[in-house]
Amino acid sequence: MSDSEDSNFSEEEDSERSSDGEEAEVDEERRSAAGSEKEEEPEDEEEEEEEEEYDEEEEEEDDDRPPKKPRHGGFILDEADVDDEYEDEDQWEDGAEDILEKEEIEASNIDNVVLDEDRSGARRLQNLWRDQREEELGEYYMKKYAKSSVGETVYGGSDELSDDITQQQLLPGVKDPNLWTVKCKIGEERATAISLMRKFIAYQFTDTPLQIKSVVAPEHVKGYIYVEAYKQTHVKQAIEGVGNLRLGYWNQQMVPIKEMTDVLKVVKEVANLKPKSWVRLKRGIYKDDIAQVDYVEPSQNTISLKMIPRIDYDRIKARMSLKDWFAKRKKFKRPPQRLFDAEKIRSLGGDVASDGDFLIFEGNRYSRKGFLFKSFAMSAVITEGVKPTLSELEKFEDQPEGIDLEVVTESTGKEREHNFQPGDNVEVCEGELINLQGKILSVDGNKITIMPKHEDLKDMLEFPAQELRKYFKMGDHVKVIAGRFEGDTGLIVRVEENFVILFSDLTMHELKVLPRDLQLCSETASGVDVGGQHEWGELVQLDPQTVGVIVRLERETFQVLNMYGKVVTVRHQAVTRKKDNRFAVALDSEQNNIHVKDIVKVIDGPHSGREGEIRHLFRSFAFLHCKKLVENGGMFVCKTRHLVLAGGSKPRDVTNFTVGGFAPMSPRISSPMHPSAGGQRGGFGSPGGGSGGMSRGRGRRDNELIGQTVRISQGPYKGYIGVVKDATESTARVELHSTCQTISVDRQRLTTVGSRRPGGMTSTYGRTPMYGSQTPMYGSGSRTPMYGSQTPLQDGSRTPHYGSQTPLHDGSRTPAQSGAWDPNNPNTPSRAEEEYEYAFDDEPTPSPQAYGGTPNPQTPGYPDPSSPQVNPQYNPQTPGTPAMYNTDQFSPYAAPSPQGSYQPSPSPQSYHQVAPSPAGYQNTHSPASYHPTPSPMAYQASPSPSPVGYSPMTPGAPSPGGYNPHTPGSGIEQNSSDWVTTDIQVKVRDTYLDTQVVGQTGVIRSVTGGMCSVYLKDSEKVVSISSEHLEPITPTKNNKVKVILGEDREATGVLLSIDGEDGIVRMDLDEQLKILNLRFLGKLLEA
């Protein structure tokens, strides 16, 4: 049958079906809407039967025609097949004209005809496509689709046609082939899919063709491919023998039907690049180079970058010689980064052209500053997480063409999250609604919901975080939440385009901050640093001789006003907190006592005329705060002699505790916890002798406990010993001996170790201090002799007990050797004894003389053998100790002899020079014993009267101008074995009984009570030695160390360097650097 006959036959069939359709529509109008839907089904069945009859007739008539090709050709679909027979133009034209005429006729009744046209015109459309007449095809489709849409035709002109309904027809169902995941060799996914296609083609016409339908290898999936098939056995048959699929032959997983559409879903990731943001190159000679975005072409998927060029000048130079040129080309060498130098290129023979603001060389554009501007594909750059280093920025340019620093920080990677909070005022900085202001209502990840402040916009709007920026106005009170000034608060005084100027509440400085680092707040900054260790206005120590006050807190540094009036910037780790000086006293220009929190006026110096409150006193310097001063937050420093107490006053409580009306300037002497006050008052017969000192009118403290040495019995500082600096009814401030740290402790956790007040106050064992100047040692009360009231031992006529030895033993020896009123020999406590829980005090007893006498006798005279003394050479012996320890050692200050004992008398100014007689250095032994016997004259020496009413005092009384430096090496309790710990190296002292072991070094293996199991290296054996016979080995530089005392006890680290008696240790736990005394460190055994 010819094509014309086919077309005529189809037309007749169409007319018949159209007439049937009209009759069916008349019937439909009579029925209800539900009934009409059911009626369409039999109609469709009749049409299908007619089509089948038509197909069978066509097959019978066309038996001689070659068989048709299958419509679904596997992997490749032919777009157009050319028929073997020649097609006549007139036949196509007739058919086309009939179609066009028919469409014009049926335009009025298109609702009834379009469905039938679609079904009947399928074959005719194939014939239309065979001829390439574009004009008539275009006219045909214009007329067909310009008047009405498919939705209007099918659904009666409804505009509510949803895309979801149309898409449901394309979704896979249970009757469709399934997708199976097959594990593949990574990187070979595409090649494996192609090899499966070739295998499918090869087996297509065999007895066992492959039963799979398709193979999918998505670009973003690594290590897997998807195979479409009805059964898993079909997949196994297809992948058998494919080398890249060996891993997945035994296990294939079926993709759920709901997830099958996601496999082929293409999500194009669009990089949101802005000009002046930073990227890096992925490949080529510019791999990993930093570049700046010049502009982006999203339509062409390209990006223009500004970068530092890499030009091979050697290659240009080698062009002169072809031989060298070919030799150079064999060895590829990545040229270094260097700015474009036009003069050098020309000197090497290169051709440089000019094009406006750019130079052209080898097809590349260079700026006049030497940067390369080149376009790359978007896939050739890395856009996420790009952070230019400081060196790269310096090489790129100091300030690259007005670069916006805010853009740099924004493009430093996705790890920087926004800091928007509900309640923030924001404005839109990008898009169509730019400059629209609003208030944040909610934050959901990167989506910010705001309520716009606009009269025409009443609904909430949602924006991405990058399109918003914080908005502030003048007068807002804000807090800095990030950056250098984090934690500071202040008032906004000026708002500029990219930053905000605010006036700090704390330091009264102007701060320049980015808007994104601010947040509205109502509270004021606490003035405490991030670590909570320091606060604004705190007195800190910069070095052993310099202190200062923190006037500005920053994230990593402090600004400190030192005692000389200079503001220095230091790191947090470089300062240490100064101990509390609230009770320090100084003298102003009119000899008034001034204290902390007093209001004073400055009458001299650079700050003359100012008035302020004293915050800190240190030596002769006072740190003052003035609310009228803006600089340094109102803090300034001046000398105390430049001050005068506001309103003036007489010396406070001076007559109660000073001699002759003298007001001491030293804060330590005037301190109520000092033993001199109690001793002096007791010595003068006041009823409060030894009661704890004077009071300055600040009666909130418990004076009974202040100054005592106590041991902490509970808590984290259990076992530590210190001196009570201040006390109330419930708590006490204790300065620890081991760490020089002052802490607050509950009084119920304290036990008194000893009393340091001379003046008759009894302690636990009836001893006042211990040795030295104690009145009673054993027994209780105030029994001056040793046993009861027996001054002579046997009868009442013998004043000296044995011979001329009045103070033979410790009991009746008020001082050690010289008189009780000898101002030249205060005889401080000599040493601690293990049978009494008494550690040496926090402060040594002051000397009654400034120059000439004993300026500071050592508090512990002899170091106890059980104490780990690292530097014993710094322990001068206490005067007067020879008689106490039955030795023949001498002291040039207190060793009177019968031949010529010298007893100094204080001059009116008490600035005399001690000059002992030459004979005073000889020790004459008593017939009764081998004890040095002091001359009787020593106990009868009377000092000359002083014009200022000065008289000799109890040892330890204050003296004008006397000073009390701390004794070196007295920071560790002598009878303590707390330093003993495992794994440290020790040395056996000469006090150990076994002489073969003495002097050997070893390592402590274990500690039980006071006994240590020590492995001796030399003798290669383990011995048990008491801790009192051991001493730790001092570590040296780069040694592994272990902290043996203090709050960091048991911590390990590496000793990096040594500065005097201190060592800088890098701790193993937190990698922090700490400065510790070498006596607190033990040397670990090297691995």
UniProtKB/Swiss-Prot annotation:
The modification Asymmetric dimethylarginine is found at R681, R696, R698. Residues 313-420 are annotated as: Interaction with RNA polymerase II. Changing R698A: Enhances transcriptional elongation. Enhances interactions with CDK9 and RNA polymerase II and enhances transcriptional elongation. The modification N6-acetyllysine is found at K718. Residues 857-866 have a biased composition (Pro residues). Changing L247A: Reduces the affinity for Pol II elongation complex. GO terms for molecular function: chromatin binding; enzyme binding; mRNA binding; protein heterodimerization activity; RNA binding. This is Transcription elongation factor SPT5. It comes from Homo sapiens (Human). The lineage of its organism: Eukaryota, Metazoa, Chordata, Craniata, Vertebrata.
